[in-house]
């Protein structure tokens, strides 16, 4: 991953910003845009890609749409892009470092997207600075299942349950969607939404590990922490990515970033 291009809080970057980021890391071999499936992001990255192509930069775009919670939402047409984005960036970055060409890396990214599934939940909302009020209201004894990363409410509100019950419900939605089957190897990610203590995320992972073992799914690698957040929202998401030996080799390749660091 050579460049990240954020917009304002919960706002897509502009085409000019994306084009500037693209040009700043162009080494002549082409650029892969990895875009979460939100309407503004997709539209602006499409415009930026066209601008970059007029300047002779080869562009490939892969849209991540791994969220099983919704087919359509306020911010997206089709499934939202969430946790699989992190896994795709790491794996594709390793492929680029290895010397794969642009088409190979884009095809690899599409495979990761096809084989990854995610779902999130929240106990609290978040407050967008420009609004100054929570994006939705929720009682202490309630929870939202299927929330988004821009403070969107979930697809279902229900009474608060135990960690085991919550993870059981979410993991079954994730597992049944691909579907994952006994014997599959996966990378599992438990991602905090910004306001959940790390100790609780490890508790969630323990429940996910138990469920995967019961289902016959082998967790080959795991990632636990705050990677795609929604300001101060208390909650988490789970992501499963089906992998083979080739993908695991790319995942295990050395990485040194503020959030991921191993093999160096």
What residue spans do the PLM features occupy?
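Short Gly/Thr/Asp-enriched flexible loops that form oxyanion-binding sites at enzyme active sites
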Residues: 42-56, 75, 200-206
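C-terminal non-catalytic interaction/assembly regions of soluble proteins
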Residues: 173-264
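Short glycine-rich or small-residue beta-strand-to-loop segments that form or flank ligand, phosphate
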Residues: 1-4, 30-39, 46-49, 60-63, ...
């Amino acid at each position: 991953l050579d460049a990240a291009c954020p917009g304002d809080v919960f706002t897509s970057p502009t085409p000019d910003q994306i084009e500037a980021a693209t040009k700043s890391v162009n080494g002549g071999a082409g650029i892969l845009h990895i875009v979460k499936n939100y309407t503004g992001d997709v539209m602006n990255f499409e415009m930026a890609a066209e601008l970059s192509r007029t300047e002779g930069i080869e562009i490939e775009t892969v849209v991540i749409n791994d969220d099983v919670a919704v087919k359509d939402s306020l911010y997206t047409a089709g499934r939202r892009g969430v946790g699989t984005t992190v896994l795709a960036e790491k794996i594709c970055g390793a492929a680029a470092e290895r010397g794969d060409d642009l088409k190979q890396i884009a095809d690899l990214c599409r495979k990761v997207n096809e084989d990854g599934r995610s779902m999130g939940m929240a106990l609290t909302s978040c407050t967008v600075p420009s609004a100054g009020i929570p994006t939705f209201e929720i009682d202490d004894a309630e929870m939202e299942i299927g929330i988004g990363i821009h403070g969107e409410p979930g697809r279902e509100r229900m009474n608060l349950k135990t960690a085991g019950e919550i993870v059981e419900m979410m993991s079954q939605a994730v597992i049944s969607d691909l579907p994952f089957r006994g014997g599959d190897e996966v990378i599992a990610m438990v991602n905090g939404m910004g306001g959940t203590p790390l100790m609780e995320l490890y508790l969630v992972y323990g429940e996910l590990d138990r469920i995967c073992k019961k289902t016959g799914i082998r967790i080959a690698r795991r990632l636990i922490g705050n990677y795609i957040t929604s300001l101060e929202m208390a909650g988490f998401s789970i992501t499963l990515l089906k992998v083979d030996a080739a993908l695991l080799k790319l995942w295990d390749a050395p990485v040194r970033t503020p959030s991921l660091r191993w093999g160096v």
